[in-house]
Regions:
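Short glycine/acidic-rich beta->alpha loop that forms part of the nucleotide-sugar donor binding site
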Residues: 1-4, 11
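Conserved Class I S-adenosyl-L-methionine
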Residues: 41-43
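C-terminal amphipathic helix plus adjacent low-complexity
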Residues: 52-160
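Short alpha-helical segment that forms part of, or immediately flanks, the ligand-binding pocket
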Residues: 8-12, 16, 23-27
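Short hydrophobic beta-strand element within catalytic cores of glycosyltransferases
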Residues: 16-19, 30, 36-38
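Conserved acidic donor-binding loop of glycosyltransferase catalytic domains
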Residues: 20-21, 27, 45, 49, ...
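Short, solvent-exposed loop/turn segments at secondary-structure junctions
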Residues: 1-2, 17, 23-24, 75, ...
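Short catalytic/ligand-binding loop motif for oxyanion handling, primarily in non-cytosolic enzymes
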Residues: 4, 25-29, 122
Length: 160
């Protein structure tokens, strides 16, 4: 899934998550740079593109206490004429089982504490609360209107 709505709903319900580090699910991990402790922003992702490459990023970031991220170890690319490429991430099954065990070993109280921390982070610093989402939507619409450039007109001709 591109954004990970089910995992976002899970965190908002104060349930910890296990996610593949891919697409929008990266945003739900609360990744921070180890170098300065700052949360990755949309501008950071615009510069780097993605944290997909575990070789480059796994040791350079930390994550929120509500998530156990699982990094893709293999990526395949397929495609067709209508969809030129689709990148498919493959995780290491033993690593997934370790993540499940991690949450199991945390116990009920540990999972509840982590879930509450996740919901709090989503509503505040990560910005998934309704007020921030409305502001981002309004800002995006304003930016689209401000930067709109009409396409050059063209004529259609009927050939006999």
């Amino acid at each position: 899934e591109g954004f990970g709505l089910t995992t976002a709903e899970s965190v908002m319900a104060e349930t910890p998550i296990i996610v593949n580090v891919t697409g929008g699910m990266q945003d739900q991990c609360g990744f921070r740079k180890k170098s300065d402790g700052k949360l990755f922003t949309a501008n950071d992702y615009a510069k780097i593109g993605s944290l997909h490459n575990y070789r480059e990023w796994e040791d350079k970031v930390t994550h929120g206490e509500w998530v156990k991220p699982v990094w893709s170890r293999v990526q395949t690319m397929t495609g067709s004429v209508p969809t030129p490429y689709i990148i498919d991430d493959k995780v290491d099954v033993p690593e997934v089982s370790e993540a499940i065990r991690y949450w199991y070993d945390k116990g009920k109280e540990g999972r509840e504490k982590a879930g509450k921390a996740g919901r709090n982070a989503f509503l505040n610093e990560i910005g998934l609360g309704v007020d921030n989402q409305n502001k981002c939507m309004a800002d995006g619409i304003e930016k689209a209107i401000k930067n709109f450039k009409p396409k050059k007109r063209f004529n259609l001709y009927k050939l006999a």
